Amino acid sequence: MYSRCIALVFVGLLASSLAANCYGPAGKLAVAEFDAFPSPVAVGGTVYIRTNIQPTYDMGSATVQLSVYYSDNFDVTGLKPVVDIPGLQLCNLSTSITCPITAGTHILAWEYRVPDVLPGTYQVKYTILEDNPPDGNPYSCIQFSITVEGQKTNEFTSWYQATLLGTALFTQPDYKLRQIGEALQVGPSGPLNGSISPVPYNGSIKYLSGSGDLVPNAFYDTSNFVWGLSGTMVKQTIGALGQISHIYQGECYLGYINNINTSIAGNFYDYMTPLIDGTFTLNWTYTDSSTAEINGVAQFQPAATIPYGWGFPLLYGRLGEHQVVTSDVGFLMIKGNMPFCTSGVCAAPPAQGGSKHHGLSSQKLGLAIGLPIAGVFLIILIAAAIIYYRKRRESEKEDGVFAVSRKPEYGSALVVDGIIEETMGSKTMQAMLDMRDDDESEHDSDDGYGRSGQSGRSGRSRSRSRSRSVSRSRSGSRDARSESDPGESASRDSDSD
């Protein structure tokens, strides 16, 4: 007799641990509310499970299949396909699951298939028993319903996680799955059209674009999204907290891959978005292989640290009729905040954790705020400089002081009240020397010699007039200088007399 093993050896019975997919352009999913009751369990113990499939709508001749397609150290027996008899409202499946004999985190995924069912709503109940008698008292009952629209294959898959710490199961506070039946947000009608080019992961977020925004727990038909992958894959399984990847018999969860064949094109369709908000990265890592086996790795990385029981299945999709290959990464952004969880306790994201959960990082947000502010300060600085320069020019003009720019041979001069205070240039200097000669000759002459004195004053007056008219041409300056020569000659004649 195996030791007792609790029914919820699978602690991860949360909204993120349960997913369903109904095919069709407007597929819907409804999940009932239930509680999870973690409790200690012995390593190597056995749990007996009886699954009641009880449809609320006649399933007709549909075949119900229950299978485990991934078991991490779990010994699962008794899972066999069951044929539903038309009109029968109850189907029972009994099985036993033996817990791993080693401590650690272990994953068990099992799947129900109800192909080709008629439109309607179906209920599925998981009745988990603690001990061997199939009719023993149930420890927990988990139920959810599926709404099928159209003649499409209906599949839904549950993932369970058991973390064995020594001889006891990892325990955490009770969690209640949020009811998402009536509050289900369905994606836009019709398919999302677009193209995604896989790019190497560089830490950035790539939005899955199309007609309408993606919302949590919504169904999207992305059959027109082409990934354009090629080659073959190598089978590999990786399991870690917050990072789950697996491909088994052509099927993979967290990036669900099914019906893979030897085609070298890839269409990713029937996308089931995560049940919780946040930023999620779907990594596809493939290497070449010469074998005919279906191989590959699909890796899913949530944006936040998550405790046991969270994180899968957060992303549900299907890759049909194609073989996916290459080494690339796809990105999916769900608007909103993903709960930030540590030690099994979930709370709102920390204030500084926004960059992990949103498209804008803190660095980009700082630039988005800082650059406009810097631009405003720059504009104010330029305007102040212009105003200061204009006021200075006006003040200088009022004082009669302004700068004059001339040709190189005339240099530049500073004119104060029409009088040249400082000059540069050979020709301008020569003009200044000529004016100095005029002044000296005028002082040497006597008032009795009116001709020479008048000529000297006339020359000085013309020189001052020439100084005030700074824009006069060079030829005009030479003419003015030549006009003063008779006065100078007369002054010299007077001196000789």
UniProtKB/Swiss-Prot annotation:
Listed transmembrane segments: 367-387
Extracellular side: 20-366
Gene3D superfamilies: 2.60.40.770
Signal peptide: 1-19
Biased composition (Basic residues): 459-471
Highest taxon of source: Eukaryota
A Pfam family the protein falls into: E1_DerP2_DerF2
Organism: Physarum polycephalum (Slime mold)
Bilayer topology term: Single-pass type I membrane protein
Compositional bias of kind Acidic residues: 436-447
Name this protein carries in UniProt: Serine/arginine-rich protein PSR
InterPro entries: Ig_E-set, ML_dom
Keyword terms, alphabetized: Glycoprotein, Membrane, Phosphoprotein, Signal, Transmembrane, Transmembrane helix
Region (Disordered): 436-497
Residues annotated as glycosylated: N92, N193, N202, N261, N283
UniProt topological domain (Cytoplasmic) ranges: 388-497
GO cellular component annotations of the record: membrane
Record localization: Membrane
Residue numbers spanned by region Necessary for phosphorylation by PSRPK in vitro: 424-450
PTM statement from Swiss-Prot or TrEMBL: Phosphorylated on serine residues in the RS domain by PSRPK.
Residue ranges, compositional bias (Basic and acidic residues): 476-497
